[in-house]
Amino acid sequence: MAREFSLEKTRNIGIMAHVDAGKTTTTERILYYTGKIHKIGETHEGASQMDWMEQEQERGITITSAATTAQWKGYRVNIIDTPGHVDFTIEVQRSLRVLDGAVTVLDSQSGVEPQTETVWRQATEYKVPRIVFCNKMDKIGADFFYSVESLHDRLQANAHPIQIPIGAEEDFTGIIDLIKMKAEIYTNDLGTDIQETDIPEDYLEKAQEWREKLVEAVAETDEDLMMKYLEGEEITEEELVAGIRQATINVEFFPVLAGSAFKNKGVQLMLDAVLDYLPSPLDIDAIKGIDTKTDEETTRPADDEAPFASLAFKVMTDPFVGRLTFFRVYSGVLESGSYVLNASKGKKERIGRILQMHANTRQEIDKVYSGDIAAAVGLKDTTTGDTLCALDAPVILESIEFPDPVIQVAVEPKSKADQDKMGVALQKLAEEDPSFRVETNVETGETVISGMGELHLDVLVDRMKREFKVEANVGAPQVSYRETFRAATKAEGKFVRQSGGKGQYGHVWVEFTPNEEGKGFEFENAIVGGVVPREYIPAVEKGLEDSMNNGVLAGYPLVDIKAKLYDGSYHDVDSNETAFRVAASMALKAAAKNANPVILEPMMKVTITVPEDYLGDIMGHVTSRRGRVEGMEAHGNSQIVNAMVPLAEMFGYATTLRSATQGRGTFMMVFDHYEDVPKSVQEEIIKKNGGNA
């Protein structure tokens, strides 16, 4: 089959937002208008097309990014619906990596919320162009201009309306297009009957004022337009659209639109904006990668004639077809039944069938082209972030980096039968979700699972029960602490065993220094003159790495340390790799005495929204939990408190907040960074863990 849509007419977009801003409903409406579904599903009825896991339908939130494809005005739009709950930021991150553009959905009553900030920051990191859709304009308290202001204040975004609403709350009846300077009035509930009219008299002045701001903002991003603007010349509609498109693609400008997905208003205009302002695969830079034959950097342009290269961004188990691998094709074409190279693992894989997904229904296709997003059946070794490419043109594309988990719980199977099934279930879930880890505690033998938050682990345990029929008892959540050194020190490790016959001999001197936060472990070999033979150097590094898994104070992983091997000695007969591995681990333990080791704990950025009367209580909550208030802002009758609080102190806070505010307060938290725990807390943790120090 020939290519159905040209690259110019392809859009790969994500829908991203804070939880409950109406993201899934917006996607539903897109699918309705583009003819993909005939009946609209409502999230609050648990019938939404994009939320296809049982837990999503029950909880009314989106957990996995469902990928679907739609058509609008002769364009193909591939949409990835991403979750807004902070525990699932990993899903957002991996989606952003393979998108060309995104629609950020805001709740017009709340404007920019904490999770909006998180996903916005991630999108900026990946240089993803965005348009902003101010949703829920029909809601009580909806305020379009407050939302625009919050984009400036909280995100420092150069965001400007390209349309403004007519009315708000139940009087929200239409939208003024600031580019055409026309009004779109909605006359029926399904949003299919739209009348284009002149701008109502009482809105004309406001529309002219906002159009002037828009023209000025766009002109600032383009020299030619700036000259015309300064000379007082008229900027045409075509020039304005072209200027907005270029500035949006360059991530210098963010068009803002208004609407209500639930009331079917503004969604078609938002789809038009996706076509007009978000990039096609041709508008973005060719993806970079490393040519595995030459080890040099290379690029893969969006071109069907180029060698095939794609990135696997999600693996999931489908109840009907088994293991599905979602991938984004950057260059070349791929036919079902062909072989590809998984360059990240150095393995050959056969593509069984290729499916194009629509939420949880699927259509089998023979071929995918550059710029497409599809799912493959039959890949055995491919995991998230792997590159799949042509056998004769190997390349490794930039992968996806995933955050480390911050919370862990012990799980134990309820029966012997569950024991065997649990191992398989956990392995499958970990394959699907790289931010979920499974480990066995060597000393206690219990299985420990770790993830990004309580909800994240709840959902995974729930899936284990439903999809794999495994019943398990779950322990209380534990914090994933870390340890590090705060002072530089030198230490010796000497391992000598002489017991008749062949002995053991390993001897090293290592200098340890603190590394920057997040940089991990760095090893440097500074041996001169072969005092430690080259073949034993990897064993020294391995010995240090192994013993860092089990820290010196309370057995938590040691992080962010530089180790420089600078001296040592060896024995011609008795030295071997094992001896040097043990010597290295002895050096690390010896260093701990003088390196000022500390325990680190995850700090959470917490945002608490409460009615004003309860502000005093909330301040008390933060300080009693070792937290610090970092700022406050009023919003309507509510106060929003931003604070930094240790995760260890936040367990069960939902209940405390509910009872303190009669159920009127809400809070959100997202992991921010690791910080030293106070001395008194450190002593308690060491005591509780039986201490290694």
From Swiss-Prot:
Superkingdom of origin organism: Bacteria
Pfam family, one: EFG_III
tr-type G domain: residues covered: 8-282
SUPFAM superfamilies associated with the record: EF-G C-terminal domain-like (SSF54980), P-loop containing nucleoside triphosphate hydrolases (SSF52540), Ribosomal protein S5 domain 2-like (SSF54211), Translation proteins (SSF50447)
Disulphide-bonded residues: none
GO MF term set: GTP binding; GTPase activity; translation elongation factor activity
Keywords: Cytoplasm, Elongation factor, GTP-binding, Nucleotide-binding, Protein biosynthesis
Primary location recorded for the protein, binned into one broad class: cytoplasm
InterPro entries, alphabetized: EFG_II, EFG_III, EFG_III/V, EFG_IV, EFG_V, EFG_V-like, EFTu-like_2, G_TR_CS
Subcellular location: Cytoplasm
Listed GO CC annotations: cytoplasm
Keyword match Nucleotide-binding: yes
GO biological process: ribosome disassembly
Residues binding GTP, per UniProt: 17-24, 81-85, 135-138
Keyword Ligase assigned: no
NCBIfam families: EF-G, PRK12740.1-3, PRK12740.1-5, small_GTP
UniProt family annotation: Belongs to the TRAFAC class translation factor GTPase superfamily. Classic translation factor GTPase family. EF-G/EF-2 subfamily.
Function of the molecule: Catalyzes the GTP-dependent ribosomal translocation step during translation elongation. During this step, the ribosome changes from the pre-translocational (PRE) to the post-translocational (POST) state as the newly formed A-site-bound peptidyl-tRNA and P-site-bound deacylated tRNA move to the P and E sites, respectively. Catalyzes the coordinated movement of the two tRNA molecules, the mRNA and conformational changes in the ribosome.
Protein name stated in the entry: Elongation factor G
Gene behind the chain: fusA
